[in-house]
Amino acid sequence: NWKRKLHVSLAFGEQGVYPGELCTLKQIIQNKKRMPLPALQVKFQADKSLQFQDETEAVVTDHYYRSEVFMVGGRKQITRTLPFRPQCRGKYSIGQIQIAAQDFFMSKKYVAVLPENTMIYVYPRQLSMKQLLNHNKQVLGEIVERRSYQEDPFYFRGIRPYQPYDPMKHINWKASAKYGELLVNSFESTYSRDVCLLSDVETDSVFYRQEMQEAAISAASTLADYYLRKGARVSFRTNGREDTDEEIVLEQCQGIAAITALNRRLAGIDLAKDSADFARMIRQIIPNCRQSRQYVCITTRPVRDILEAVTLLQSKAAEVLLVVPQIAGEDVQIPAGALAWNI
C-alpha cells in the first residue's frame, strides 16, 4: 500500500494574528517506510486573502491553489515553511489535502484525499486611538485617577515626605537613608471601570458597504483593547452573527486574555448573514442597565431609530457614549454629542 506509513499535514504557525502580520504555514511530509516515493504530488487550497509570498508552485484565482511534487526518500521527512501575510479579518481553515503518487514505472497513478483541520484567526484591524483620544479624552475617561477611593500598590507615582498618617510599610528606607529624612512611596488611586460596548455591524452605505462594516468591527475591537488594557471590566454585545449563527455576547471580561477571546469571536463574524436590529438590541438591555456602567454604542449609521434608542438609554444610565466611525469618501451626519472617529 503506497499510503502506508505516509503522513502529510499542514499547520499554521500562529493561532491568531492581526492583518498584515507575517505568519507561516508548515507543510510536513513523513515517509516512515523504507520504500521511497519518487514523485509525490501534494495539493491544497487556501483563501487568497492570506496572500502567500511564494507563488512559484501555486495559482491564485478565486483561491490560492498550491501543487508541488516531492521526491521523498525512505524513512525521510520533508518540511516546507510557507510565509504569508493575511489581509482581511476572518476565520480561515484548510480542510483537506490531496496527494498523488505513481509507481516506479510511471504506469499507474494513485490519488487520495486526506482530512486536515488547521485554522487561523485573523483579528479585526486595529485603528489609531490618537485622533479619538485627542478630542475626547475627558469623555472616554482615564482608568487611573488621582481622586478615587483607594491607593493601588501596582500604580507607583513617586516618593514624598513622610506624614503622621502614613503606614510604616510605605516608608522607603533606602531613599530615606540617602536624603536624610523619612520618605514614603506614593501610589496612584485607581478604580475598575465597568464598560459595556454595543456594536452595530450593519450600514446604510451603498458604495462602501463592506469597508463601513469592517470599520465598525475594527472600532469595537480597538475600544475593547483600550479599555481592557486599562484594567476595566468589559461587556460586549453585537448584532453581527458568527458563521454558526451564534449571538456574540460577553459579560464582564477582564485582563489581556479577554482581548484574545473577544477578537476570536469578532474574527468569526459572517457579514453575509442577516444582522439583528441594533435599535431593538439597545432597547432590550435598558431594563437591566446599571448606573455604575459606562455604555459605548458604536455605529456607522446614526439613523433616527438608533438615536432614539440611545437617547432612551441615556435617560436610564449615567454615562452613555455614541461613537460613529467614518471613512474617507462616505458623508455621515454626526449627531450632536456623538464622537466622530475618522478612520
Language model features by range: what are they?
Residues W2-E246, Q294, I298, L312:
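An amphipathic, basic-hydrophobic helix/alpha-beta surface used to engage anionic
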Residues D245-A276:
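Short, charged loop segments at secondary-structure junctions
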Residues F187-S189, Y226-L228, C253-A257, I285-N288:
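Short, conserved, surface-exposed binding loops centered on an aromatic residue
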Residues D47, Q163-P167, G255, D277-R280, ...:
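General structural signal for secondary-structure boundaries
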Residues N1, A267-I343:
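Von Willebrand factor type A / integrin I
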